[in-house]
Amino acid sequence: PALTASVPTGGMLLFGAVREAPERRADDPALLNSVLVLDEKGAVVADYDKRRLVPFGEFTPFKRVLRVTKMTVGDIDYVPGESSAPIQLVGLPAARVLICYEAIFPRSGDDEAGWILNVTNDAWFGMSAGPHQHFASAQLRAVEEGLPLVRVANTGITAIIDPYGRVIVKTDLNKDAVIDGGLPVALVEPTWFGKHGNSTFLVVTLLLIGVSRISLMFPDE
């Protein structure tokens, strides 16, 4: 009821949540790190489950072999979500969701997203360089795709970033603040990276190898 009351008329509330993974045995429970979208009636109209999990933070790799526990509270591991599809929001372009450190990875797969939503908990970084590095990674995702990015961080840095990576507005670390701003428009044409993805790096690598071989064949006298 409290969450529903905070949804504006005709609007939506997007928030992070931990929920139980479905279809698990009673003796093998697991959790999902999720973003849920609530409408004014209190119904969940869209969701996304984090796909890239933090090793030793959200799950323990090779758990039976290493016999170590997570660095975070709780014994139950998280499991990755199954879909990377953008979430559909009434009155807005489809949104690609990146939860926490998913923002440090380039996109994988094609979709029809019109903007990027990055929801993160950076509190554990404290007043270090971590939040600033994490924020810079999110900026890079906007530039790669030519898409605006809205970043929501519980302790900052929360921001709206345009498709060129320029910061429209942002908050400071550990400061109470509210951002009220419009969503920048995505680039008309997809970027090279948006079209070709990680194959870009293969092309650049081959070009560099070719230039190096030519330089060896025709050294300067």
Model-identified regions with their sequence ranges:
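Enzyme catalytic cores with a strong preference for nitrogen-chemistry domains
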Residues: 1-221
